Amino acid sequence: MIKRYLQFVKPYKYRIFATIIVGIIKFGIPMLIPLLIKYAIDGVINNHALTTDEKVHHLTIAIGIALFIFVIVRPPIEFIRQYLAQWTSNKILYDIRKKLYNHLQALSARFYANNQVGQVISRVINDVEQTKDFILTGLMNIWLDCITIIIALSIMFFLDVKLTLAALFIFPFYILTVYVFFGRLRKLTRERSQALAEVQGFLHERVQGISVVKSFAIEDNEAKNFDKKNTNFLTRALKHTRWNAYSFAAINTVTDIGPIIVIGVGAYLAISGSITVGTLAAFVGYLELLFGPLRRLVASFTTLTQSFASMDRVFQLIDEDYDIKNGVGAQPIEIKQGRIDIDHVSFQYNDNEAPILKDINLSIEKGETVAFVGMSGGGKSTLINLIPRFYDVTSGQILIDGHNIKDFLTGSLRNQIGLVQQDNILFSDTVKENILLGRPTATDEEVVEAAKMANAHDFIMNLPQGYDTEVGERGVKLSGGQKQRLSIARIFLNNPPILILDEATSALDLESESIIQEALDVLSKDRTTLIVAHRLSTITHADKIVVIENGHIVETGTHRELIAKQGAYEHLYSIQNL
């Protein structure tokens, strides 16, 4: 896992190395303070060979040099270190999120059907951010603290070997304590992160569906459901906190014993005349420079434990396999005719589930309009979703112009199929930018022309800023009919040879339906058009109507032919016209 993460770090290794070098200088400067104290005590105050004026003179020079170093030299070094560290870590996170976003766009509809959006977002935002601590702590600060400890110990050995050995007495206990606590802490951190992601996933769904909550007046019930998720997170967070508190209490106890031992041994040596008072004072100063980094290392282990847990979750997402892949030798094939052949196609969402579609055979000619009807759950929309490869067939094949759709590059295939759904998604951007999703390189004139053909131009011009009006999240500032017309404008802009209308007008009022149906009639002209419809009055003009029940095609024909047959279609049509 760490090795994989380091692949993201590798391009910035020289910046990290530079950050460590600058950090060594930054952390090395405070090590002058204990030596200054020793000089002030032994070299000036207790130096009976100097007069009072000479003592003041020597002390003034020493303090002046120290002030110059700490006031003039150290601040820019600190700035450079902080800037380098933050720039590097943020750039690495940028690269990880970029890879994750591209990966998410390549994952199929199956992945999104099986995972909460909130949990996915939590991994891209929260977990990636948490891995930043691995960069700052694991790749930078830990090394700086270790180097600080080595330098401090070197100076302490130089000052007095016995005192240094006394300070090192507690090190084995320190290592044992870290070993005992932090394996358990990593597991608890992973559980806490998962619980937090569940809270975020629940919250994301309920905020998006707040209108449903309010319409059924179930705020109290949803508050209870949220409290269950929140309580689960609290329980795991407190368990993590308790174990973390145990570890810090144990570690701090061990590191607090060290200075007490050193002061006791040092005072005895000073009384016996083995060391000077200045040496003891300097040694006590270096104790903080020794045990301070040790305590930070303990905190670093906690931080890294959390970072590793998040890293696990990030790579779990990166390792999600693409179940929709470009086949070997796939090409950006141009669809010239738009003929579709569905050949013995069966489909099931998961291996342990019953098939949704069973041995479907159907040929659709160039420019033909074919409607799929039937009871809900029969497999109409599922069949439609197989054509742009939102899912892959379980068995059989789908051909377009004689080419298996798996021979197309996925992007090339989908770009040549226009899809208008019942609930079209608009992004939180302007009207113009939402239309441009159909073809991002289109000119303003082409955008306006597409809007006119979709019967959208007039209402757009009545908006406060026209085409520059912000539509809000998911197009919340627009009506259902207005959103649908913008989605149709996208298709006009893209001008694909194949058109799929999946319940495109079923949720609209009669006036909006009439306006949109007019635009759809223009849009479907001279294109192979597939329509999924519950409202049968909207598809009586179709060249072919296909009735699907329980995953099988049970009837095929024109409206007139199927009415005359008095079968499944005639039954559905009669019910709707009672």
From Swiss-Prot:
The keyword Nucleotide-binding applies. Its EC number is 7.6.2.-. May be involved in multidrug export. Transmembrane domains (TMD) form a pore in the cell membrane and the ATP-binding domain (NBD) is responsible for energy generation. This is Putative multidrug export ATP-binding/permease protein SAV1866. It is an enzyme of class 7 (translocase). The lineage of its organism: Bacteria, Bacillati, Bacillota, Bacilli, Bacillales. Belongs to the ABC transporter superfamily. ATPase activity is inhibited by orthovanadate and activated by the cancer drugs doxorubicin and vinblastine. The chain crosses the membrane at residues 16-36, 60-80, 139-159, 163-183, 245-263, 270-287. InterPro entries: AAA+_ATPase (IPR003593), ABC1_TM_dom (IPR011527), ABC1_TM_sf (IPR036640), ABC_transporter-like_ATP-bd (IPR003439), ABC_transporter-like_CS (IPR017871), P-loop_NTPase (IPR027417), Type_1_exporter (IPR039421). Keywords: ATP-binding, Cell membrane, Membrane, Nucleotide-binding, Translocase, Transmembrane, Transmembrane helix, Transport. One of its GO terms (molecular function) is ATP hydrolysis activity. Residues 16-306 form the ABC transmembrane type-1 domain. It is found in: Cell membrane. It is a multi-pass membrane protein. Residues 37-59, 160-162, 264-269 are extracellular. GO terms for cellular component: plasma membrane. Homodimer. It comes from Staphylococcus aureus (strain Mu50 / ATCC 700699). The ATP-binding domain (NBD) and the transmembrane domain (TMD) are fused. Residues 340-575 form the ABC transporter domain. It comes from the Bacteria.
